Amino acid sequence: MANRGGRHARNEDSENTINYVQCDGLAVMKMIKHCHEESSNMDLAQGALLGLVVDKCLEITNCFPFPKSGDETMDEEMYQLTVMRRLRRVNVDHLHVGWYQSSDVGNSLSLALLESQYHYQTSIEESVVVVYDTQKSSRGFLCLKAYRLTPQAIQMYKDGDFTPEAFRTLKVGYESLFAEIPIVIKNSPLTNIMMSELNELLPEDKGHNFLDLGTASVLENHMRSLIERVDELYQEAVRYNKYQQVVFKQDTEKHRALAKLAAENAVRTSKGEPTVPEEEVIKQFRPMPVPARLTATITSGQINTHAQHIAQFCSQSLAKLFITESLQNAKETKEIK
């Protein structure tokens, strides 16, 4: 994915003028269909977004899937160029404005996502990444979100410095890596008329599906993913603590060696002998490479996302429980009468 945004080069330093994303219903349906087809195979669905920028709105009018990475004979760049060239022939918007990918259990933040969006956004300044959560949407909650890298995250990637000092200087945390862009879905008037007619043909929903309490597997998946991310963050913390211990030990030995050298230089000075420069001792202690903190930051963001999903799921389940209890009590009261 990292090299899929290498076309339509734009000024990297231009201001972000996109206030919201407007997505056509047809493009949304194509994304949903592709993501659900790939989710059955446990694969990550990805594709290109096509459209144009109007004032401060990024309009997504079409999309097409990327070929599967397992097909080594497929030239991805040539495939995308061919698709856009053919769309242009039939007078369809063919400008590349970003990409989309599927997400499972709400876990969309990853190193691959950051790297891909960085390459897109530095070559196509208006580009966005649209993330579709297949599992949450299958429960009746359409989860379609658009993101862009923040200027701080782009600067951090541009510098290639992921040390703790760089994170503090740029004030970058997991909550400031991406900026969510509001997304709206627009349909044509004819589509709205057809949807209204279809809605009248559907049988009345009694609401039992919305009050289904047998969703323990959802909470179980979130808890399992949360435990895995916490364990990964713990391993990152152990590595960083070991680095700090090694640095502290090295600094102690260096100060001890400098103190010993200072005493020896004092004796040499009293005897009229030349002193040994401190650089001779300092160069014996090479600075330890600072471990990158990007992985730990991403893991922290994933933990925060899972915690938010668990809190939201539990609040919805409690609401369902109280509603079901009230309906059951009303039903029993009616039967008694």
UniProtKB/Swiss-Prot annotation:
Record-linked Pfam families: eIF3h_C, JAB
GO molecular function: metallopeptidase activity; translation initiation factor activity
Superkingdom of origin: Eukaryota
Family matches, as CDD domains: MPN_eIF3h (cd08065)
PROSITE patterns according to UniProt: MPN
HAMAP family hit by this protein: eIF3h
Protein family: Belongs to the eIF-3 subunit H family.
Name this protein carries in UniProt: Eukaryotic translation initiation factor 3 subunit H
